[in-house]
């Protein structure tokens, strides 16, 4: 298909308000085709997409006819009815999803990661009313974690810059320290995970356990720097939650459905959550869908005397009734199963981390390389000894230089002031050895370009 670029750019500038974009002097890029891991722009230039759609979503790659056909077929048969009524793809998808999540039981559908987390917060607060006389409604969140863009989820946001100018926020949310191993105040010690986790207990005791009902965390901090918790961390978090009767919510919006080499990120860490939220990779971006998944125990807290008209979960999501989402999600899971993409993710993830670490000898501004599966971060610093973060302008230039080299990468952005210095990589689970090597080579070239530009 041919396009009139000048016309589209003019219309874009006139009518479109882009996400996360300063529009002063803005020249829009327009992508017109995706196939596998490749994106083609309106000028015909092709890029290797190492960020799965920019925000870590297209887990099984572009151009999946199987998913498109499943959605089209379902839309013709039954496109929508509010989710108080059952439909075939929701039932089948829910069964399939729960089969990947031992210990979990119920699936509640909505439209986005923010919405999925809002549902989790409402569950916690209503349980506080139903079981604790209005107490235990507070929610603890971890510094540098991100859970969404609504006022409620921003109230639980550990990334200060994302919250600027959007307050006042909802009451009853409390922050506890991050799990950044690279910059840990505890240094290198055998029980680092336990020490980091026990910082949660200190906040609980300060706020008061009777005021608190839940803890929410990402399995790996994503947009806050790709932080992988150390051994022993989540086991201790779970023990603390049990001690103070707190529900553990794990936000798998980024890591869920294979991103880290397991179905869910938490499955690397020997921890059983009470609530799991997910979105992005659930349908690989082919249709909007998110899920709030609970244990049977949590679900049963809302199965009460019908005469009590306040005692069930009085919540709805309009597009939680759109059947395209679960139809796409079911096909997405079947592709991951059939093509052994979890195994491929683990293998290619190891190759990616090895390749990136191999660049450290050549590029001294690389302070740390970390990640799990096909989810990796490269923290850039002025000096490895002091770990002083590089200027954000340098990290921004790296993204641009990588694009010039034909590879789309990301970076932490508007997250943690002075620490928006981590490059982010999240290629599709279908990546081959050749794809990984091309990503590493593109980043190597970008580092050389940027180092020369800034005299580093």
Swiss-Prot record:
UniProt xrefs under Gene3D superfamilies: Aspartate Aminotransferase, domain 1, Type I PLP-dependent aspartate aminotransferase-like (Major domain)
Pathway listed: Organosulfur degradation; alkanesulfonate degradation
The protein's Enzyme Commission number: 2.6.1.77
Keyword line: Aminotransferase, Cytoplasm, Pyridoxal phosphate, Pyruvate, Transferase
Localization (cell): Cytoplasm
Single GO MF annotation: pyridoxal phosphate binding
Noted pH dependence of activity: Optimum pH is 9.0.
Biological process, per Gene Ontology: alkanesulfonate catabolic process
Modification type N6-(pyridoxal phosphate)lysine: residues: 280
Broad enzyme group: transferase
Cofactor(s) required for function per UniProt: pyridoxal 5'-phosphate
Catalytic activity field: taurine + pyruvate = sulfoacetaldehyde + L-alanine; hypotaurine + pyruvate = 2-sulfinoacetaldehyde + L-alanine; 3-oxopropanoate + L-alanine = beta-alanine + pyruvate
Lineage: superkingdom: Bacteria
Temperature dependence: Optimum temperature is 35 degrees Celsius.
One Gene Ontology cellular component: cytosol
Pfam family, one: Aminotran_3
Self-association and partners: Homotetramer.
Biological role: Involved in an anaerobic respiration pathway that converts the sulfonate taurine (2-aminoethanesulfonate) to ammonia, acetate and sulfide. Catalyzes the initial metabolic reaction of anaerobic taurine degradation, i.e. the transamination reaction between taurine and pyruvate leading to sulfoacetaldehyde and alanine. Is also able to transaminate hypotaurine (2-aminosulfinate), beta-alanine and with low activity cysteine and 3-aminopropanesulfonate in vitro. In addition to pyruvate, 2-oxobutyrate and oxaloacetate can also be used as amino group acceptors.
UniProt similarity note: Belongs to the class-III pyridoxal-phosphate-dependent aminotransferase family.
Note: Taurine is an abundant dietary and host-derived molecule whose metabolism to hydrogen sulfide (H2S) by members of the human gut microbiota has many prominent connections to host health and disease. The human gut bacterium and opportunistic pathogen Bilophila wadsworthia produces H2S when respiring sulfite (HSO3-) released from organosulfonate substrates such as taurine and isethionate.
Protein name (record): Taurine--pyruvate aminotransferase
Origin species: Bilophila wadsworthia
